[in-house]
């Protein structure tokens, strides 16, 4: 399915970002999760979804795309662009992505390098 069929044009698409953070009472808040969704206006059904969290990777707090899904590659690309813009503003130098549900050709064509020892791909954030 793509946005043209639902909304009459891709110009009516929006990237929605839902934030979840947590903290102990009186303590500092921490970022737990961002959910990015690409939706046509007035549609409850997303065309693409991405779940982002912030685990330590290689000793540093990192931006990790736990899930990136959507039928059309161009819809996933819209979310990748939004996530990369967020990463750039927040100072994350690398995007990490779980490769378990991804086509390798998609990852390589988007500039990701796949780790040989774990199911993670990485790409430097473009400045």
Model region roles, listed by residue range:
Residues 68-69, 98-101:
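Structural motif
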Residues 30-38, 42-74:
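Conserved donor-binding loop and adjoining core beta-sheet/short helix segment
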Residues 100-118:
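Conserved active-site alpha-helix within GNAT-family acetyltransferase domains
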Residues 9-37, 41:
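Active-site rim helix/loop that mediates acceptor-substrate recognition in acyltransferases
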Residues 1-11:
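Short, compositionally biased leader-like segments
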Residues 87-99:
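Conserved GNAT acetyl-CoA-binding A-motif
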Residues 117-127:
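STAS-like cytosolic regulatory interaction modules
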Residues 72-85:
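Conserved acetyl-CoA-binding loop-helix of GNAT-fold acetyltransferases
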């Amino acid at each position: 399915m793509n946005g043209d069929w639902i909304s009459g044009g891709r110009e009516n698409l929006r990237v929605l970002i839902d934030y979840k953070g947590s903290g102990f009472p009186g303590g500092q808040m921490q970022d737990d999760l961002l959910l990015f969704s690409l939706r046509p206006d007035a549609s409850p059904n997303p065309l693409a979804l991405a779940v982002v969290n912030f685990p330590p990777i290689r000793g540093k707090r990192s931006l990790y795309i736990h899930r990136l899904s959507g039928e059309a590659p161009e819809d996933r690309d819209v979310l990748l662009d939004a996530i990369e813009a967020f990463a750039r503003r927040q100072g994350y130098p690398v995007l990490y992505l779980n490769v378990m549900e991804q086509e390798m050709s998609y990852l390589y064509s988007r500039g990701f390098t796949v780790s040989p020892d774990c199911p993670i791909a990485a790409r430097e954030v473009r400045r």
